[in-house]
């Protein structure tokens, strides 16, 4: 069997940034078109080459294909997003680290400080939103391409992944339980698979894009 090449830093960075956007705000009409585009299909095909991600990618591909069968797909996705991530009842999957007892309070602020980052004033959500963790991981993977800070950024990447994995499995399980159509459930499963896959790489500072 031919071994597939590992994902490189820039690919991780782009995938994390894409996922951050999808978990931060509702999919609008333009976003729906992009989800169903050849560009996203190519990205998913790239991820699918990794055996650890193949099943999660295949499930998300099925859910994206199913969107074409839903009347008013954009409005229904928006309703799914609102019900899962903006409500506070027991049938939601709130994307905030502080909602999960496993997470040390204020961890994301320490991680951002170490990375020399801060939350933009225009960001109206709490700083421990899932999207902030993913944007941080995206930034760290891009920074790994700069040789003078590889060691420090890789160590911070590992700390961020470990912190995220304290509560991401429960978040994913909540998405599975409460997403009736399954798009965000599939998206969260792919995210969890990617984070676990990334966490399994001890030192990504040696993996460089050609």
Curated annotation (Swiss-Prot):
Keyword terms of this UniProt record = Chaperone, Cytoplasm
State if Ligase is listed as a keyword. Answer: no
BP GO annotations: protein complex oligomerization; protein folding
Listed InterPro entries: Chaperone_TorD, DMSO/NO3_reduct_chaperone, HscB_C_sf, TorD-like_sf, TorD/DmsD_chaperones
A GO cellular component annotation here is: cytoplasm
Does the UniProt entry include the keyword Ligase? no
Question: In which compartments does the protein localize?
Answer: Cytoplasm
Q: Name one Pfam family in it.
A: Nitrate_red_del
Q: What is its main location?
A: cytoplasm
Q: Which family does it belong to?
A: Belongs to the TorD/DmsD family. TorD subfamily.
Q: What's the stated role of this polypeptide?
A: Involved in the biogenesis of TorA. Acts on TorA before the insertion of the molybdenum cofactor and, as a result, probably favors a conformation of the apoenzyme that is competent for acquiring the cofactor.
Kindly give the PANTHER family that the UniProt entry links to this protein: CHAPERONE PROTEIN TORD, CHAPERONE PROTEIN YCDY
* Descriptive protein name: Chaperone protein TorD
This protein's gene is called torD
């Amino acid at each position: 069997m031919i071994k597939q090449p590992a994902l490189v830093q820039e690919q991780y960075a782009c995938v994390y940034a894409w996922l951050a956007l999808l978990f931060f705000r509702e999919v609008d009409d333009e976003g729906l078109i992009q989800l169903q585009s050849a560009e996203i299909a190519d990205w998913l095909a790239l991820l699918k080459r990794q055996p650890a991600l193949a099943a999660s990618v295949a499930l998300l591909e099925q859910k994206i294909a199913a969107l074409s069968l839903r009347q008013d797909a954009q409005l229904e996705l928006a309703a799914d997003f609102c019900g899962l991530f903006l409500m506070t009842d027991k049938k939601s999957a709130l994307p905030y680290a502080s909602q999960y007892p496993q997470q040390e309070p204020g961890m994301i602020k320490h991680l951002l400080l170490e990375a020399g980052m801060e939350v933009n004033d225009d960001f109206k959500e709490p700083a421990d939103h899932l999207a902030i963790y993913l944007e941080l991981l995206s930034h760290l993977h891009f920074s790994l391409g700069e040789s003078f800070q590889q060691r420090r950024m890789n160590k911070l990447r590992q700390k961020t992944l470990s912190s995220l994995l304290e509560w991401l499995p429960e978040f994913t399980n909540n998405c599975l339980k409460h997403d009736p159509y399954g798009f965000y459930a599939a998206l969260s499963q792919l995210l969890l698979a990617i984070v676990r896959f990334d966490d399994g790489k001890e030192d990504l500072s040696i993996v460089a894009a050609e």
